Amino acid sequence: MNDYSQLEKRLNYTFKDKQLIIEALTHKSYKKPYNNERLEFLGDAVLDLIVGEYLFKKFPKSDEGILSKIRASLVNESGFTLLARKIDLGSYIYLSLAEENNNGRDKPSLLSNAFEAIIGAVYLEAGLDTAKEISIKLLEECHPKIDLQSLSKDYKTALQELTQATHAVTPGYEMLGSSGPDHKKEFEIAVTLDNKTIATAKGKSKKDAQQKAAKIALEALKK
């Protein structure tokens, strides 16, 4: 994939340095002298600032605790995966054949990392304001209703309220394992009900994995 025009159109930004967008789209499995991990590191910090400032201005009466919860619900793997899919980012990523055959183009972790890298690349070339314009536009397109109730949802609390009402029990959370290097660990958590596993999920922290697993469990119990 050497034609990035459609991706740039969706971003509403054209890279002057094409090597920068190539690096942002290169997964480490592709075995080039470069990959997108450094740009991902930068993009993660840039997005944290952009979303933090956006929420600070949007909710002038909300305290730090509420703002942190809302930001955490947007600035995470599932949140960035949603934005990546909005611009069909998976179609442009450079992957190894093994990763390609392992459905790598649709992996949340891979999509999320590539999105962070793209924003990091935009920031390097065009600055914070342009990175902000792109990020906020996509954020608002994917979340037409950004408000306290819809974005500060605590899935663990919601699951507990549901299971206590319907089963008279409190859900449990069991650590199944962790993988990856120390600076980039991924944790797997299982939600149990009456000692039976009802959902599992992975996340960048134990809390993140618990929230994801609780969300999956909620959806399953409501069917």
Curated annotation (Swiss-Prot):
Residues 154-223 form the DRBM domain. This is Ribonuclease 3. Keywords: Cytoplasm, Endonuclease, Hydrolase, Magnesium, Metal-binding, mRNA processing, Nuclease, RNA-binding, rRNA processing, rRNA-binding, tRNA processing. Mg(2+) binds at residues 40, 113, 116. It comes from Sulfurovum sp. (strain NBC37-1). It catalyses: Endonucleolytic cleavage to 5'-phosphomonoester. It comes from the Bacteria. Digests double-stranded RNA. Involved in the processing of primary rRNA transcript to yield the immediate precursors to the large and small rRNAs (23S and 16S). Processes some mRNAs, and tRNAs when they are encoded in the rRNA operon. Processes pre-crRNA and tracrRNA of type II CRISPR loci if present in the organism. Homodimer. Residues 4-127 form the RNase III domain. It is found in: Cytoplasm. Its main location: cytoplasm. GO terms for cellular component: cytoplasm. Belongs to the ribonuclease III family. Its EC number is 3.1.26.3. The active site is at residues 44, 116. Its cofactor is Mg(2+). GO terms for molecular function: double-stranded RNA binding; metal ion binding; ribonuclease III activity; rRNA binding. One of its GO terms (biological process) is rRNA processing. SUPFAM superfamilies: dsRNA-binding domain-like (SSF54768), RNase III domain-like (SSF69065). It is an enzyme of class 3 (hydrolase).
